[in-house]
């Protein structure tokens, strides 16, 4: 069984994902299938939690839509995830930002911004 898991993880090893941390504002392009049609749907929000590592990594993203808080748990290596873009790097002092659930309005999305040096390519 361990060999099978290692084989699957080895096939996913080449997939490049950006460094995502709690507090980051992200845009995730999800592939949505409705009937016979397929389209991309963007989900913008703040990462309030990350869990797992490697191919099992998931993030919980929260956004406010029409005054209602919406959270999605998204597996990063899912075939339905087209792309993950980090819009802003947030500065968080906790690994889980569940306290954002109690906040309303703009305060629900406010996290201090973290300055990140660009990687030389």
From Swiss-Prot:
> Would the keyword Ribonucleoprotein be found if you checked this record's keyword annotation?
yes
UniProt superkingdom: Bacteria
Q: What Pfam family is a match, any one? A: Ribosomal_L19
Write out the entry's keywords from A to Z.
Answer: Ribonucleoprotein, Ribosomal protein
Molecular function terms in GO for this entry? structural constituent of ribosome
GO BP, sorted A to Z: translation
Query: Which positions are tagged coiled coil?
Result: none
Which Gene Ontology cellular component annotation is one that this UniProt entry carries?
Answer: cytosolic large ribosomal subunit
Under the heading InterPro entries, the entry gives:
Ribosomal_bL19, Ribosomal_bL19_CS, Ribosomal_bL19_sf, Translation_prot_SH3-like_sf
**Its biological purpose:** This protein is located at the 30S-50S ribosomal subunit interface and may play a role in the structure and function of the aminoacyl-tRNA binding site.
| Protein family per UniProt | Belongs to the bacterial ribosomal protein bL19 family.
Please identify the protein, giving its name as recorded. Large ribosomal subunit protein bL19
Gene (name only): rplS
């Amino acid at each position: 069984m361990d060999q099978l898991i290692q084989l699957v993880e080895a096939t996913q090893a080449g997939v490049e994902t950006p460094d995502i941390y709690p507090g980051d504002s992200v845009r995730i392009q999800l592939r949505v299938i409705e009937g016979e049609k397929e389209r991309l749907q963007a989900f913008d929000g703040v990462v309030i939690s990350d869990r797992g590592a490697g191919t099992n990594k998931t993030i919980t993203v929260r956004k406010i839509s029409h005054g209602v808080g919406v959270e999605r748990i998204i597996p990063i290596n899912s075939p339905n995830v087209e792309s993950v873009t980090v819009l802003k790097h947030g500065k968080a002092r906790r690994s889980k930002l569940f306290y954002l659930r109690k906040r309303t309005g703009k305060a629900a999305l406010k996290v201090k911004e973290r300055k990140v040096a660009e990687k030389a390519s």
